[in-house]
Amino acid sequence: MTVSGALPPPVDLWAPVPFDDLPAGLTDAAARSDWPAVKAQLRTIMDSNTTDGAYGRELLQFVMKVPLPSDSVLVRYRASISVDHGDWDGLQGYLASDLIEAIELVGIRDIILAPLDRRAPPSSSAEHHRILFELYDCQFGRAVGRFRRWARRMPAFYPEVLWGRDDIPVGRHMRYRRLQDAVLRAVAEAHGGSLPVAEALAAEAGTLGDEREPQRDVAHDLEIMVRHARGGRLEGELGLLRRIASPTGLSPLGSWEVSSSVMPFFSYLDDGSLEWAARLGQNIAMRLGSPRAQFQSRTWIAAARIADGKSADEVGLAGLLAQARGAAPGLRVVPLLLRALVSHRPEDFRIAESAARQAGSVWAQVTALTWLVALNPQPVTLRWLPRLLESTGWRRPLFVPASVAADAALGLAAAGKRGVSIVELAGVGGRANVTVEVAMRHIDDAEAPDAARAAAVDALGKIGTTHSREILHRISRRTDGIGLAARRILAKGTLNGTLSERELEVLDLARHGLTNKDIAERLSLSRHTIARHLANARAKLGAANRAEAAAKFEEMQV
């Protein structure tokens, strides 16, 4: 793992921020009380429909603080900012002025404050209101399947009403819409669809919109983590959480929305990002007074603590499950999955998988099915897991230890299932003997797809053991395409063929943070033997120390 960027300290998103990053023309005009100039500047950068922009909380607090003469545009700005901060009393005051239309703001307010069992957004006769309400309701109800359908429809929607609104700078809004459409579609695909599509859309989003738009940070981090979910290395500098904590970060509501959109993927990180984001979300939800936002955040705090070794009682899982019984389908998925992760009971995973399927939450479905195949392979799970892996691109299911992924791959191969996804799932499992077994079942099966057999040969080349290299030499004598692929790998003359099985096993455990004593106990060997294996591995890899050897080993695995 080479992801860089330390977590920021806890942040109060309601605390005052300086105005250092605002345009000089805006702050200078305010300093000399030139209110027409201030209004003119604001109309180019302040959008009451999408309040979170390049200047973040600095601009929002400036608009609330500056003593501008009141008019309908300023009231609309401030009413939207009140929604962003959960200032429901302030919102009531702005609505009472009769200077602005209430339906949009009231609809969003009611969605935020809706109970756990809410399953549909407020009704409206206007199409642009229905579309806006559905987005918020999908987010607060975690209705992944419905959200994915919404995200696919959204690019075709063109709101004529924008041209008649003075509180929306149309140029910036149109550029932002292209960015938002790509990011939301990427998020929807990452949670409930195709990871290759999600990665491509996230990459495209990085080129859209204006510079410093926070949605670009979402796209950047999502692209990195989706690539890892597809089997790639986890590398790059993640910046979303630091952006949220900065003065130009998003409003409280916007921060909850964007952090929730990538929350499951924070579980890949071992730096506390998941709990940091979940606790921030809980603080926001409490200040907003949102039952559904608070329930989601509490659930993710429990997930982070369970991943850290805490028991179900310590994280209050029983209370979450009790609340989940009456909740909308999307809100039930993670609590049910957590119950299964704690109990390891196949029946609990089956219930979690059913809930995930109902909500359209593909990531949770893949997780539950992977555990089921590893624990208790049955015909239905053996049929559906490889189909989902192939169609969605998942290779590192969330909340699935590498050893469980390896067991699932072996179970699929032993049951006669063949596919590139199965070979790659075995590879990320990190157990050389399992990868060899799965690869050989594909290579020896003449009925296996050509792409899967080629992937199996490639997997043998990546394992990095003497045994795997011997197998490749044997395969290279074949006269078919498999033999040609083996000869090409052998011709590369890479280092990774020099490690023994035991050296590989010891180095793999060392890179996961185990001490020599821990490894010795795990493998029933002496600490002296472990030290010798590590020394041999370092020498063969040309590594100066244990950490460098672990890093080179990880490169070999990828």
Predicted regions located by residue number:
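Amphipathic alpha-helical scaffolding segments comprising HEAT/armadillo-like alpha-solenoid repeats
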Residues: 36-39, 348, 382, 432-444, ...
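Alpha-solenoid helical repeat architecture
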Residues: 33-37, 70-73, 100-111, 119-132, ...
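Alpha-helical repeat scaffolds
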Residues: 56-63, 88-99, 116-123, 143-154, ...
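Extended repeat-based scaffolds of very large eukaryotic assembly and lipid-transport proteins
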Residues: 416-455, 459
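Structural detector for internal amphipathic alpha-helices that build alpha-solenoid repeat scaffolds
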Residues: 40-48, 334-342, 367-374, 423-430, ...
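Helix-turn-helix DNA-binding segment
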Residues: 437, 441, 451-454, 488-535, ...
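Residue-level signature for tetratricopeptide repeat
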Residues: 28, 44, 81, 133, ...
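Inter-helical turn/loop elements of alpha-helical hairpins
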Residues: 3-7, 11-121, 133-145, 189-200, ...
